[in-house]
Each structure stands twice: as C-alpha cells, then as structure tokens.
Amino acid sequence: MAEDSESAASQQSLELDDQDTCGIDGDNEEETEHAKGSPGGDLGAKKKKKKQKRKKEKPNSGGTKSDSASDSQEIKIQPPSKNSTIPVQKLQDIQRAMELLSACQGPARNIDEAAKHRYQFWDTQPVPKLNEVITSHGAIEADKENVRQEPYSLPQGFMWDTLDLGNAEVLRELYTLLNENYVEDDDNMFRFDYSPEFLLWALRPPGWLLQWHCGVRVSSNKKLVGFISAIPANIRIYDSVKKMVEINFLCVHKKLRSKRVAPVLIREITRRVNLEGIFQAVYTAGVVLPKPVATCRYWHRSLNPRKLVEVKFSHLSRNMTLQRTMKLYRLPDATKTSGLRPMEPRDIKAVQELTNTYLKQFHLAPVMDEEEVAHWFLPQEHIIDTFVVENSSGKLTDFLSFYTLPSTVMHHPAHKSLKAAYSFYNIHTETPLLDLMSDALIIAKLKGFDVFNALDLMENKTFLEKLKFGIGDGNLQYYLYNWRCPGTESEKVGLVLQ
C-alpha cells in the first residue's frame, strides 16, 4: 500500500529485474515470495547451501514465449546523439531510469544483508525502519480524509483492467499468468501451480470486492501481464482488532520486469483499499523489507520420498539409501484419533468457537465470523481439507486442516507436478497436537500428496522434528502496513496466508 503523494522520483524507485519470481517488494521485486516462500525445499540431513551469487539470465529466457506486442514493450535506453532533438523531460526520464538501473541491488535475504540495503520505496511508506526500536502500538499515519480518486498512470502501452474472476475466460488468463510467471525456487526447478478453483477460494472470501482484483493488460492486444489482489480480514495485533486487507498474488510478466509496472500496482491497490476506508494491510515476503513483525521458517515432511529425490526437491542423506529413506518416512495405513471425520456444514459454529478461542493466545491472528469459517474450512476437493474430532458426547474438541497447492516441476522428463499439502489451522483442546498432526500426514499420504509443508508458527515447533519434518532453506517474513508494534516470535504468529 503506497503513498498518494509520492514524488516522481519515489514513484520510480521500485525496480524489477528479470528474475523468475515476484511478490511484494518495493525496491527489489525479483525474489519476493508470498505466503509460502519458495516452492522448493531440501529434506536431506545436510542442507544444500544456496549459491549466493546471482545467476545472470539470458535475454528473453524463462517462461513461455510472449506475443510480439508484448515483446515490443521492451525498454531500450540509448544515450542521445549530440544532434538529438529529444525533449528535456525525456532526457531527464532517461537519466533517472539509468540511475535507477545502476543502483539496482539484489534482494536482502537476511537482516545482515538488509542493513546494507537501500529501500528507496519503503523509506517513503508508513512502515517502521529496520533499525527502529518499537515499544508502542498503533497506526503510523492517521486515516486519510481525502483519497485520490483517479487511478495511477501506468507506463505507456499498458492499461488497467479489474478482473471479473466469475468469468471463466478471465480466470483462466489469471491462472496462466501465475502459472508461467509466479514464484519459483532459487534454482528455478519448481513453480507454484495455483488451480483456477483454488484462486476463486483464495480471492473471493466473504466481503471480497471486484475492484480489489487489479490487473494490467497490454493496450494493443489486451494480454494480461500483471496482477495484485487484496482481500478483507479482521486481524488482531496483540490487543487491537483491525479491519484490514491481506495483499497477495503480486505478479508481473517476466518480460516486463523492467517497466516499473509492479510499483504502480502496489500504489494502485493501496488507493483502491483506501477508498473503502481501510488503511492497514498484512502481507508476507521471502525477502527482508522494513520491517518484519515476525520471521517464520518452512519445514517439509516427505510423503513420497522416491519422487522427491527424483525431482531433486530433497536429497538422500549421507549413508542413506533410497530404500532406507522410504522406510524412515513410512506412515501407518489408517488414522488413530477416535471420532476423526471430515468437517460438515453443521460444524461451522463449533469450528468458529474453537478457532477464535484458540487463536487468542497469539500476537498476530485472524478473528473469523461464521461465514469466513465456512469459506476457509469447509472441504473442497483439491483445495482445502478439514477434519474435525467429535467426542463420544457429540462435542467437537479439535480439528486439523491443510490446503492443496501443487508445484510445476520444471525440466524433468517424467514428473510434471509435485502435489503439496500446506498446514493451515490445527486447533486442539483434547487430542494431543502430535497425534492430530500425525493423522494429518496419514490423510495427506492416502490422498496422494508427495510432501506436507508447515511453517514453524503457532505450536508447530512441538511436532515438526518428532514427525520427521526437515527444515527448509528460506524464511518467510510477516509485515504490517501502517501499523507499528513490537516484533514477535514465530510461535506467537497465528495467521496463515495462502
């Protein structure tokens, strides 16, 4: 969410390069990752060290071919000749662009890197500085009385389009954009594959607004090349409950990542949210920006070790054969918790009460009404699974949930997709959490998942190692826009974004 009154210079301070991921960043969008961090992982005993050196990408590499109209949008900056009659304003624009390109930095992956990083965009925003010591709670800026009415200007050759996801053709366009251009792991081996049905679930919860599905098209051929979304949520931050938005699915076509389309997307979604009287947001990123309220880590539990090794998602540990690895990760054929069954509509009220009561112990968590509980938890095939525990007297005491998010396996001759389950909300009052999550793994395995992923938030640290999860190789930072509060530990985070 960006400031209306940004100067021309700060409006251009967000730069994209041609790396293969994108998400919410301001000054380096290339590898920001949303709620799941990277789709890749490494489950070997010795964690593979990521190469620190950035790979240089060949021109026009990666992804699918764009059509000629899209390709023609490439920026080519050449110094003007002495006899040039280029207007002064144009020369200034070229000079500014060259300065920005020369100042381009790679994304900060940790606090040490972030301390040396220049955040030209975020320094203009109502977010805490990285070195700021915070002891207070509250909004950084007061709510605006006058919000800009006109959309922000896009670079020449592009146009705004509010996406009607109820239109199957438009939904398919968004699916294609994300499938071909969204978050990849550092080695460009896996890319999230959000299904059209999953996108409807994630982007149309209760209270969703059409204008918060914000797209960018090429003016000439109407090709969809950019997107950002907001959905409403009531979020409790320590003792304050605020109506805010969750920002997600910021994506720009690979071939357009030098056009400053993403910064305008961020500013435009801010404007559209502000018009509805909302001035706070929550978002996640795999890079360090000013200033994380919490940092979490992904863990991975192998369900199909053979496939994970074959696609290089994980690696055999030292002195481990594939057969021994498969035996290590073998699971029972049936769950053991008595009264465990799929959630039904009649369970909504009980699940709501369990959820809101349980989440009160955390510093950052949603507050859900019945309609939201129905939307987020009622089972939908290939999207969301929720299993409740009903005791002998008919009372619901616990539930587990996970959502489905496959990843496309790139450059593999046999395997094209990796089926991943992501831990969602797991609430327990009587069943030990370890038993509940053991059953979650068994259910996921029986449903054909290859891997089960979980963040180390809430009480998850109590079962991760015991259930043979392996630590992932990247962090996921949580951020608040226009809200200042002390940072918190991962185990005090009670919010999961898709």
Curated annotation (Swiss-Prot):
Subcellular location: Cytoplasm; Membrane
Keywords: Acyltransferase, Cytoplasm, Membrane, Phosphoprotein, Transferase
Domain of life: Eukaryota
Chemical reaction(s) catalysed: N-terminal glycyl-[protein] + tetradecanoyl-CoA = N-tetradecanoylglycyl-[protein] + CoA + H(+); N-terminal glycyl-L-lysyl-[protein] + tetradecanoyl-CoA = N-terminal glycyl-(N(6)-tetradecanoyl)-L-lysyl-[protein] + CoA + H(+)
Gene3D superfamilies in UniProt: 3.40.630.170
Residue numbers carrying Phosphoserine: 38
Comp. bias regions, Polar residues: 61-72
Compositionally biased intervals (Acidic residues): 15-32
Comp. bias regions, Basic residues: 46-57
Gene Ontology CC terms, in alphabetical order: cytosol; membrane
Membrane topology note: Peripheral membrane protein
A GO biological process held by the record: protein localization to membrane
Disordered as annotated region, ranges: 1-87
InterPro entries, per database record: Acyl_CoA_acyltransferase, NMT, NMT_C, NMT_CS, NMT_N
EC number(s) stated in the UniProt entry for this protein: 2.3.1.97
Coarse class of the protein's main subcellular location: cytoplasm
GO molecular function, one term: peptidyl-lysine N6-myristoyltransferase activity
PROSITE patterns assigned to the protein according to its UniProt record, in alphabetical order: NMT_1 (PS00975), NMT_2 (PS00976)
Annotated binding of tetradecanoyl-CoA, by residue: 117, 122, 250, 252, 258, 260-262
Family membership: Belongs to the NMT family.
Function text: Adds a myristoyl group to the N-terminal glycine residue of certain cellular and viral proteins. Also able to mediate N-terminal lysine myristoylation of proteins: catalyzes myristoylation of ARF6 on both 'Gly-2' and 'Lys-3'. Lysine myristoylation is required to maintain ARF6 on membranes during the GTPase cycle.
Protein name per the record: Glycylpeptide N-tetradecanoyltransferase 2
Organism annotation: Bos taurus
